[in-house]
Amino acid sequence: SPLSDVVLYENTTGKDAAYYPKQLAVNDYFIQDSRYLKTYANYFCRFVSAYREENISISRVMFQNEPWAYTIYPGCAWTPEGIIRFNVEYLAPELKKQHPEVSLFLGTLNTNRFDVVDKILSDSRMKDAVEGLGFQWWGGQILPAIRKKYPYYKYMQTESECGSGTFDWKAAEHTFRLINHYIGNGCEEYTFWNAILSDEGKSSWGWKQNALIRVDSKTGTITYTPEYYAVKHFCNQVVSGTRVLQYKEKGEDNLSVIAFLTPEGKYLIVAGNYGDVAQQMTVQLGEKYLNVTLQA
């Protein structure tokens, strides 16, 4: 309604439609009362403790999944001021008090509005409150710029894009490109929303999504999707301690490339050809050159 637009969201006149979200909530969905904030921080710690009793160790937490998503599924939108307040004044101190072994990351950052995320990180207290930053969806667009300005944080990707139940080659190419982008821009981890789905990939919320493995619920047969093999190109070779030397995003040439150096001192090249014809690719490694043909 016109009233809710005024009360809940900013005026978007003159704003670029490429921004997500197009409108920002100007009020925190979480009540900004110290009683609630303190209780919520304590809840995080109790959650960690409860899982420990079941012999499940939690090593990292983030304050909110997609604080800039106004959706039908459970969520909670926050303003920059609310995010700073809760993380700096409540969650970080309580975690350090009750569970100093658990690290706190700021995430999951799902907006491509650099000014909003920059406003949060520019608070001088943030660097002592959080150890790293987690990006997903539209947030990945501003990852390079944020990392350039704030190089002292650890970085991770927090949710691969789930697709629409196609389970096809194009979905695999999309994920391959995303991994190249996030790892190439300093993320030490890449995570998935769905490892396994059945049949048409319909989620519990009623929409179709993709997964690495597809199960036929009637026969019990398993299909490893093209996306599974796209991921395998990275995870069966890139081990802990591997460093990124250089990377190239997919461009007009339809090629993406990332060069690694393994702990054993070996070069590892992972490249993708997104075009419909085979292409030649040359990678220079010092005084040596690698020439290969990437099939379509």
Question: Each PLM stretch: what is its role?
Answer:
Residues 1-119, 123:
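Substrate-binding cleft and catalytic face of glycoside hydrolase catalytic domains
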Residues 61, 133, 182, 231, ...:
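Conserved, mostly hydrophobic/aromatic
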Residues 100-105, 125-169:
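Glycoside hydrolase catalytic-domain groove-lining segments
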Residues 63-66, 106-107, 135, 157, ...:
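Conserved beta-strand positions
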Residues 247-286:
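Carbohydrate-binding surface patches
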Residues 68-69, 73, 110-117, 145-178, ...:
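Active-site clefts of carbohydrate-active enzymes
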Residues 157-232, 246-249:
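Aromatic/acidic polysaccharide-binding cleft in carbohydrate-active enzymes
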